[in-house]
């Protein structure tokens, strides 16, 4: 690889994309990669998600199209060659169809390799685009992309199967989910031992259908009968709690105001505010139907929190099959039992079995593994034997 052209995502305060480019650039520099970031234009400087829930629908499209304008100019100038690689941080990058259109009509020496990261989309039945009615056209888009890219990066072994049974043909590589642990620790360094922290369980996912808000609120009410001092919190980057269904917001605010749960909604959190809350919390909880690895688990682990997630889809892999981090989906009773066990371990300062720090260490290696896949084809999963890797622990 002569040069890497990096097609990143626009920055949002409430999303991991705020830091994603810096995480990548740090590893590129460490590895001695000759790279160029292809930037786009932003609609405004709010760094806010207004239309949609994952990324802003207008902002995402505007940024991506302007990114492509800049890359097209470089290709027109002959600055991008067959010895180069273009890497897209997200498969859905509006305007991507121009790439095969130009390359198929260009001399072979001006056809770079193209790799991208596939995060979810139509192969996940619980992805937001399914509930928004985007399946039919998005699947056709994905099939188009699968015709011309050189490789697809995914976060977990479990997701490989979803792509293969959907008919994807191109090489698939398992890398983990990109994360920059050192950058996060530079923002906030946890100093308070777990047993001295606020008795708090946090929830850091979107407050939307696919994250099952009602399950979390059911748990909060049930655990109030076990330990009324344990706070159940929502960590939200928006100025007000936002959801695709108002009923989730209404119930959360009612719980906060009522006396059936110790419930608190934190809103308007900047990234460092969120990290400081994690650094003073004991547990991060997840009950998502749709989550492939999740940056929240890496962030919580970095901040010294215990993490309790469902034994579902990619999470056994995320935790290297450590049952202490997982509960039976979707059992409130089992989640309560696991929380009680965590509380006992915290109170007695016996935490070795939770492997704190190792979870985020593995994801911290994702960007390096992505480079290795592009350079050497490492961690490729074939068409017939991809399931043999599923039960193997990624770390010890």
Task: List PLM regions with ranges.
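Conserved donor-binding/catalytic core segment of Leloir-type glycosyltransferases
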Residues: 190-224, 232-233
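A charged, aromatic-enriched C-terminal amphipathic alpha-helix characteristic of glycosyltransferases
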Residues: 330-333, 337, 341-396
